[in-house]
């Protein structure tokens, strides 16, 4: 935790909490862009146009990402910012041929899995193995309940025989943990079935944070159930799993722009600019990039903020938070310790949205707490509901995790991913209960039509207002 933060307390609390309690005019209530400023959705459309012209995605290491970084850098330079491009390399894997999953002829119901029902995970190992199938703590009787822990603990693999293929269920822990536990038990392959709750039944895109030594596939809930039944049958089930991937290293870059010097305390505001290879990534995460970019452009037209701000657009988040990890790891120790707060924007235009404000409780400081209150106050003044989440881990991670791991206080603004909105949230935020916040998460349909311009505008306005009211850093820093 940054050692200077206690010295900020008096000015900080007064400045931010005064903002949180400010009165709102009736003309502002419920509007997306209340100050007559430009619409952040224009940046979403520009990034969609880039994806369309570059193979349908903006994945790190592709021309779509490079053109996206050029667009953001050009916008910032046009507003007067000095832009820094932070180059780094990242490991990648690409399929050389389609994956395959076949239930062997010795099983009770032989079949070959249709191509549309399976995918290889990013950073899967290559391999073509035929071996007995073993289900691991699937808990299918509780399939309507979120929170499967299948494969999350090494104890789940008690009785697992080396040389078998593990069938696990998507759930609460990272894919990496499931695969590492399976490898430790001697598995020669892993099949991850979708969880089976609303919004998590189809085949899904996933990534491993480090490359696996064995092939790893994802399959639909329906296909997983068929495999589970075969694994439990009287006749031993044998499956063939094939993944053929090319691995290597590619280069990409972060886009960084500072407003004010960073010789003292400063705030970092960021969102990832890359998409998954499967689609253009408009909600995930052109929306967050658009909010950060629009806030930077608006503030460039105003007097300097009291607290210096670094605006960051991360590359290779979808490959394992690599851009933000590179940035944090490359900072001199003194500069890293002077980061007073990191604010992350990831997926802030979900069509069936909620307005989530996340904070990691153990890293919470006066500045983080006051900023959360300022954001909640902004929305409260406009009769716009929010939901605060503490201990936020976003399951499989966003770039705030890179900063939190380095002891930096973090806040995340988020409107929901593939999980289902519950009835209480539908009552508070509108939308449809038991349906995903984002039905196109990590899919080709994550286009501009998958972004709600209203909530994107609301998030952008709130972010801009909080940034312009940040207190000055303590003197002598």
Model-identified regions with their sequence ranges:
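Extracytoplasmic/secreted proteins, especially bacterial periplasmic and envelope-associated proteins
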Residues: 30, 39-42, 46, 63-78, ...
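N-terminal capping segment at the start of a domain
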Residues: 28-63, 88, 274, 347, ...
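Metal-dependent peptidase/peptidase-like ectodomains
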Residues: 113, 262-264, 277, 304, ...
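His/Asp/Glu-rich mid-to-C-terminal helical/loop segments that flank catalytic regions of hydrolases
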Residues: 420-477
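Soluble metallo-hydrolase cores and metallopeptidase-like ectodomains found primarily
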Residues: 119-151, 208-282, 294-297, 301, ...
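Bacterial N-terminal signal peptides that target proteins for export
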Residues: 1-12
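Bacterial N-terminal signal peptides
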Residues: 11-22
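Noncatalytic luminal/extracellular "stalk/propeptide" segments of secretory-pathway proteins
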Residues: 45, 49-163
């Amino acid at each position: 935790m940054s050692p200077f933060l206690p010295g900020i307390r008096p000015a900080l609390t007064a400045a931010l909490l005064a903002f949180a309690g400010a009165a709102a005019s009736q003309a502002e209530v419920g509007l997306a862009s209340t100050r007559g400023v430009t619409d952040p959705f224009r940046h979403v459309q520009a990034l969609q146009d880039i994806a369309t012209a570059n193979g349908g995605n903006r994945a790190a290491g592709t021309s779509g990402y490079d053109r996206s970084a050029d667009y953001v850098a050009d916008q910032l330079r046009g507003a007067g910012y000095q832009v820094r491009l932070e180059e780094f390399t990242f490991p990648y894997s690409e399929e050389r041929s389609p994956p395959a999953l076949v239930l062997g002829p010795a099983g009770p119901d032989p079949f070959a899995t249709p191509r549309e029902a399976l995918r290889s995970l990013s950073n899967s190992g290559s391999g073509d193995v035929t071996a007995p199938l073993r289900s691991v703590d699937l808990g299918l009787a509780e399939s309507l309940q979120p929170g499967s822990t299948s494969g999350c603990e090494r104890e789940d693999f008690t009785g697992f025989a080396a040389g078998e293929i593990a069938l696990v269920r998507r759930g609460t822990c990272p894919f990496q943990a499931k695969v590492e536990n399976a490898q430790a038990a001697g598995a020669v392959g892993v099949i991850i079935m979708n969880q089976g709750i609303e919004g998590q039944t189809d085949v899904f895109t996933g990534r491993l944070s480090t490359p696996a030594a064995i092939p790893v596939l994802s399959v639909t809930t329906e296909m997983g159930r068929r495999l589970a039944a075969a694994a439990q049958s009287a006749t031993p089930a044998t499956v063939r799993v094939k993944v053929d991937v090319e691995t290597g290293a590619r280069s990409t870059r972060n886009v960084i722009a500072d407003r004010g010097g960073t010789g003292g305390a400063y705030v970092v505001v960021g969102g990832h600019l890359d998409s998954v290879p499967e689609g253009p990534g408009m909600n995930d995460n052109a929306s967050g990039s658009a909010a950060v970019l629009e806030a930077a452009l608006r503030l460039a037209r105003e007097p300097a903020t009291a607290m210096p701000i670094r605006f960051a657009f991360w590359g290779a988040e979808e490959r394992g938070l690599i851009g933000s990890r590179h940035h944090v790891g490359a900072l001199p120790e003194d500069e890293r310790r002077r980061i007073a707060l990191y604010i992350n924007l990831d997926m802030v235009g979900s069509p069936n949205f909620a307005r989530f404000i996340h904070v990691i409780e153990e890293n919470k400081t006066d500045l983080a707490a006051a900023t959360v209150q300022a954001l909640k106050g902004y929305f409260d003044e406009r009769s716009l509901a929010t939901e605060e989440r503490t201990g936020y881990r976003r399951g499989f991670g966003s770039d705030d995790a890179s900063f939190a791991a380095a002891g930096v206080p973090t806040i995340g603004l988020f409107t929901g991913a593939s999980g289902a909105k519950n009835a209480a949230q539908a009552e508070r935020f509108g939308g449809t209960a038991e349906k995903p916040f984002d039905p196109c998460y990590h899919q080709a349909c994550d286009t501009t039509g998958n972004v709600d311009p209203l909530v994107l505008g609301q998030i952008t306005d709130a972010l801009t207002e909080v940034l312009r009211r940040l207190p000055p850093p303590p003197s002598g820093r």
